[in-house]
From Swiss-Prot:
Biased composition (Low complexity): 86-104
Name of this protein: Uncharacterized protein MT1950
Region (Disordered), start-end ranges: 86-109
Pfam families: Macro (PF01661)
InterPro entries reported in the protein's UniProt record: Macro_dom, Macro_dom-like
């Protein structure tokens, strides 16, 4: 065993996880190593600190995958599998699947091997592309759930964007000391496409501007520019309270007061939306500021994700009773949406009144797109 460890250190130094990368020290066989040149190697060991990506076992509560940055990226690398009781798999083969790619049952001896700590897993783990980084680890508090999966696919094509199996739930992936959050997806579903405007780790939010009555929009949630006491007495707030009925104001009173820049939800009452998210943009009758508008927008987006909303209508915060300049409010709100890393949220509609408001928000969206392209 000592000789094998020494050989691994000489041959595959990148398989060792260092504390400098923010990961705990693991044994040499805890990592999955791969080669772009078509050769095979040992990989994916069932270490006591890890649960192997194998049939009959849950996906790891903490999996470490190391990849060499010196190798060129590949669209589909050969399967890597090895066992202390079986010869290593030939490059391009997949021991856990048949010729058609369908799952093949595992024999009892193989299952017994997988249950023993320290024995190299017999099932293939395929890597697609490269992360351009040394290591990736799964947060131990959010394990993936892949019961009885004969083959798991680690898609490392875009900085650890996805780690998929037949069944999985939300997970967080640690990459080079930073947290990247997976989209909130139902079991068995495929992740949504990555964003092209704010980074590969988040999903795209469609931005729209409409001159519309926010109380008539059939979306998951609409927003209300409220005061900290949630008394909906004037402007858009009064229109929302009238359209929602007495239940909306009753719920608001129960949840009041809230702090400036905070957001709470109530039911939408008689309106077609499911929720109303009330964001406190000012004190009762008082002015607002750019910092409050930015904080209120961010809090509204987070609340929409917490509620599992896919679509959200935003009104122009602070531009009515608050007296904040329309162009500045549009720029701040669009910027907050672009910085937001969504969970369930896919569509944001800016519901505005008048041509001036429509031009302001449309210009803010266009300016953000021009900046992203540069």
């Amino acid at each position: 065993m000592a000789a094998m460890r020494a050989h691994a250190r000489r041959r595959h130094p990148h398989a060792l996880m260092s504390r400098a990368a923010g990961l705990p020290r693991l044994s040499w066989f805890a990592g999955l190593t791969w080669f772009a040149g078509g050769s095979t190697g040992a990989g994916c060991a069932a270490h006591p600190a890890l649960a192997g990506l194998t049939a009959g076992a849950r996906c790891p509560a903490y999996a470490a995958i190391s990849a060499s940055t010196a190798r060129p990226a590949a669209t589909a690398l050969p399967a890597v599998a090895a066992s202390t009781a079986r010869p290593a798999a030939t490059a391009g083969t997949t021991p856990a699947t048949g010729a058609s790619g369908s799952a093949r049952p595992t024999d009892a001896a193989g299952m017994a091997d997988l249950a023993r700590p320290g024995v190299v897993a017999t099932h293939a783990v395929r890597t697609l592309g490269t992360t351009g980084s040394r290591a990736i680890g799964l947060c131990p508090s959010q394990p993936l759930d892949c019961p009885r999966s004969p083959q798991a696919t680690l898609n490392l094509g875009s900085m650890g964007r996805s780690l998929d199996g037949p069944q999985w739930r939300r997970a967080r992936v640690r990459l080079c000391g930073r947290w990247w959050r997976r989209s909130n997806t139902t079991r068995g579903a495929s992740p949504r496409p990555p964003s092209t405007c704010r980074g590969d780790n988040v999903s795209m939010i469609e931005l729209e501007v409409h001159q519309a009555d926010v109380t008539k929009l059939e979306l998951d949630a609409i927003t209300n520019a409220a005061n900290t006491r949630l008394r909906h007495a004037g402007g858009v707030a009064a229109a929302i309270a009238r359209a929602g009925g007495p239940e909306l104001q009753r719920e608001s009173t129960e949840k009041a007061p809230i702090g400036l820049g905070e957001a709470v939800e109530t039911t939408a009452g008689d309106m077609p939306a499911r929720y109303v998210i009330h964001a406190a943009t000012m004190e009762l009758g008082g002015p607002t500021s750019g910092e409050i508008i930015t904080a209120a927008t961010a809090a509204t987006l987070r609340k929409a994700d917490e509620l599992g909303c896919r679509s959200l209508a935003l009104v122009a915060f602070g531009t009515g009773v608050g007296g904040f300049p329309l162009d500045d409010a549009a720029r701040l709100m669009v910027g907050a949406v672009r910085r937001h890393r969504p969970g369930s949220l896919q569509r944001v509609v800016f519901a505005v009144h008048g041509d001036a408001a429509e031009r302001a928000f449309s210009a803010a969206i266009q300016a953000g797109e021009d900046t992203a392209r540069r």
